[in-house]
């Protein structure tokens, strides 16, 4: 979770209240206070509220929560006349660009630190370590529009931020601290993303580093914001959060034309929610008027829509609002978590551990004892990772998303091993050996069950290592098994084995096939195993598949 530093003097001015009130009430909007210092307080917010990752965002929320200023913040934008073009050659690298012009900023040292902290927090929470989104903030008055986002030769040179000499982009990946940290995001591409102005001067090498030319200082009055990435929704989330935070600080926002699209609009989204459903979930008896009033304190526009519904406008910066229940959570916060009456459950039972988490816990104990580090892959993935890269045929029972928002997340995972291979790719710049395991749900034929997978990558990884780990795991799980030669194409012929229990293949282990290593751009051998945990004694029987 992100820890945000909130300077008292700045926050008091923006929030319109005193520091003690802020300290007393900020935990009620979903924060944990980490440290209280003489001039600031450090507060930890959950990753689902990146709009609170700045003093400006916290002040906006506190004004509503305390009843100082309720309802939807009024944001207006006007056209800047500035245009941005996007090179089609970036389609497979970082295809999406979001931008805005922010004028009349007042950047003292404290405000610059706040802006940079917001940028880095968004890189973590929204950008997934700059993989999905990278943010650039530039002094607009040092460059000349229009701007171009291009696929550049790798030997293009410019002066990177905090350096005094020109370097090629390849040199930056090796010698610049940010280059070393994020080289893995671009180093495998033939060309690199680059942002240049009308005079072909470099503003930024996303997602690595800005140019020294556009450094933001206390003298900066007008900012050009760029957000590049692989996920359009995440890119625009970052744009909206930064723009609205700076508006709270007194700036004005102007749109930029990106490939014919004016952005940002900062327009709210409309929803209609049920009062009865909210009341049932929260154990309250709310009227539409009461519910609308509570939502206005959470900075929504809300009005009763008949006798049973409330029509609301959701601020553009609230990227966490995905479902009606997210709205109901805000109703509970505005009502006051401390105002809910504690009640004992209606029934009393004797508890015991469910067998499925018991099996998962046993697996974790064994694998960590073998020196493996647990990873938690995403539940959603795509068929390229699951099947094509692994040289496997698609499983007929794969559950596909009807309306995926990203090409990277189109199906629910049916296996964990491909996702661990993807994690090895993401960490190939880290030192070896790396040993990872994952235990979690997979879905086939609309049935959810538990699997485990493990990988070990280093120059000496081999069949014996995978066999030894599989043997220890099966014995510790009380599995009576035999091993037969496997035909799994993800593994190397002659160095692979199937785990058989009661005549059924329930797992596989061995050395990953070189073609699979190549598909994941891995340069060292990988020993791996995978096991279906429904074979473990005591695992509940699965329902019949449709």
Swiss-Prot record:
Q: Predominant location of this chain? A: cytoplasm
Cellular component terms, GO, for this chain's entry? phenylalanine-tRNA ligase complex
SMART domains, sorted: B3_4, B5
Q: What is its EC number?
A: 6.1.1.20
Residue ranges of the B5 domain?
Answer: 266-342
Its localization reads: Cytoplasm
For this entry, list what GO says about its biological process.
phenylalanyl-tRNA aminoacylation
Q: Which Pfam families match?
A: B3_4, B5, tRNA_synthFbeta
What cofactor does this chain's UniProt record say it requires? Mg(2+)
Q: Tell me the protein family, please.
A: Belongs to the phenylalanyl-tRNA synthetase beta subunit family. Type 2 subfamily.
PANTHER family, per the entry: PHENYLALANINE--TRNA LIGASE BETA SUBUNIT, PHENYLALANYL-TRNA SYNTHETASE BETA CHAIN AND LEUCINE-RICH REPEAT-CONTAINING PROTEIN 47
Q: What is this protein called?
A: Phenylalanine--tRNA ligase beta subunit
Q: Which gene encodes it?
A: pheT
